[in-house]
């Protein structure tokens, strides 16, 4: 099964299934000399882990990460960093009744066609449980980026019809929904309570931004910074759309409005989202991500079994009524992984590049 690795110079490979004994990751390319402890990674994992509040899945996992290699006396050695998280709260019996039945909207049907065999327990490899390792690896990337003055942060900006009118980043850090609008938080909480009563789910939208990225990062033409960012974000479970900058709003914009005019004192706008020609402009990089509502709900639906017979299905188990909540730290992690990779690529390929053009983004 290829497709389990991401990145070129800062590269991660993950392994493990939702109901297997453990999840793991190998991080290659981290420079030597970075101070790193399990506590650094745990802080990020605690923001993502299940069972933390009444608005997410009831599955409770400690998500205690272990650093197996690549760190000696609290400092990275430049060798591969091995990470491991043990699964401790599996309830595989929740899926025994549907082991031969395909859950609509999930990867059951497509995995069966691709491999001829699948782990039916919680989706196996296709489960969002895998993203715990992305968050752990992303925490390493984030620490590297912060040393360069770069900050990556994300927020829940929409849940169903409830839209946040603004993003107060301090507010994002203080509430369990990662939403930056206190008024929207209350409406979202009420929506989740209603969804739980109905046994249904809802979609969401997330905004991610990176500040402090200097001009020049990105590798045209196929490894454009925004292309790699879009791929990274689209690889997250349930993500169905990614837009960079003004995204789909550019359809109704005119060139005179959309172009980000420049003056000696800086850019006059940032419709491009901090990327021009696939290369960072030095302005804040931002993107929006749309996530579908989970199909694991308590409402009966139509499907088929592995032999093609029609079946009715009600998904048991413990699931998030809105996957967008716990996706926020995952979005941050994937963004950090992309930026760390492009930071190393810029150093490797263009370290001696010089220009007389001033950096007007500062």
Curated annotation (Swiss-Prot):
Keywords: Amino-acid biosynthesis, Aromatic amino acid biosynthesis, FAD, Flavoprotein, FMN, Lyase, NADP
GO cellular component, one term: cytosol
Function: This reaction introduces a second double bond into the aromatic ring system.
PROSITE patterns per the UniProt record, alphabetical: CHORISMATE_SYNTHASE_1, CHORISMATE_SYNTHASE_2, CHORISMATE_SYNTHASE_3
Biological process, per Gene Ontology: amino acid biosynthetic process; aromatic amino acid family biosynthetic process; chorismate biosynthetic process
CDD domains in the record: Chorismate_synthase
Positions contributing to FMN binding: 125-127, 237-238, 277, 292-296, 318
Cofactor section: FMNH2
Protein name: Chorismate synthase
Pathway the protein acts in: Metabolic intermediate biosynthesis; chorismate biosynthesis; chorismate from D-erythrose 4-phosphate and phosphoenolpyruvate: step 7/7
Enzyme category, top tier: lyase
Molecular function in Gene Ontology: chorismate synthase activity; FMN binding
Family: Belongs to the chorismate synthase family.
Annotated NCBIfam families: aroC, PRK05382.1
Keyword Nucleus annotated: no
Pfam families named in the record: Chorismate_synt
Positions of NADP(+) binding: 48, 54
Domain of life: Bacteria
Reaction(s) catalysed by this chain's protein: 5-O-(1-carboxyvinyl)-3-phosphoshikimate = chorismate + phosphate
Species: Idiomarina loihiensis (strain ATCC BAA-735 / DSM 15497 / L2-TR)
Annotated cofactor note: Reduced FMN (FMNH(2)).
Family matches, as InterPro entries: Chorismate_synth (IPR000453), Chorismate_synth_AroC_sf (IPR035904), Chorismate_synthase_CS (IPR020541)
């Amino acid at each position: 099964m290829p497709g389990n690795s991401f990145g070129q110079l800062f590269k991660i490979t993950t392994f493990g299934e939702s109901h297997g004994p453990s999840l793991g990751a190998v991080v290659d390319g981290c420079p030597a000399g970075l101070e790193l402890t399990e506590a650094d990674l745990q802080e990020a994992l605690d923001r993502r882990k299940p069972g933390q509040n009444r608005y997410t899945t009831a599955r409770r996992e400690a998500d205690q990460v272990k650093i197996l290699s690549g760190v000696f006396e609290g400092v990275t050695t430049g060798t591969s960093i091995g990470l491991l998280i043990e699964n401790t709260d599996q309830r595989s019996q929740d899926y025994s009744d549907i082991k031969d039945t395909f859950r609509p909207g999930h990867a059951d049907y497509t995995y069966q066609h691709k491999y001829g065999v699948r782990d039916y327990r919680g989706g196996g490899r296709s489960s969002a449980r895998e993203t715990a390792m992305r968050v752990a690896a992303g925490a390493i990337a984030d620490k590297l980026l912060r040393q360069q003055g770069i900050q990556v942060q994300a927020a829940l900006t929409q849940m169903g019809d409830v839209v946040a009118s603004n993003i107060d980043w301090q507010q994002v850090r203080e509430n369990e929904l990662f939403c930056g609008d206190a008024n929207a938080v209350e409406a979202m909480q009420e929506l989740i309570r209603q969804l739980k009563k109905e046994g249904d789910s809802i979609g969401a939208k997330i905004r991610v931004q990176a500040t402090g990225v200097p001009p020049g990062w990105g590798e045209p033409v196929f490894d454009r910074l925004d292309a790699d960012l879009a791929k990274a974000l689209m690889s997250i479970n349930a993500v169905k759309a990614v837009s960079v900058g003004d995204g789909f709003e550019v359809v109704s914009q005119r060139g005179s409005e959309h172009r980000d005019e420049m003056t000696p004192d800086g850019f006059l706008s940032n419709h491009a989202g901090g990327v021009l020609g696939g290369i960072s402009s030095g302005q804040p990089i931002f993107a929006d991500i749309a996530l579908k509502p989970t199909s694991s709900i308590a409402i009966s639906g139509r499907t088929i079994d592995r032999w093609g017979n029609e079946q009715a299905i009600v998904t048991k188990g413990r699931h998030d009524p809105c996957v967008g909540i716990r996706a926020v730290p995952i979005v941050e992690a994937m963004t950090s992984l992309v930026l760390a990779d492009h930071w190393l690529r810029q150093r490797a390929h263009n370290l001696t590049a010089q220009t007389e053009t001033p950096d007007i983004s500062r």
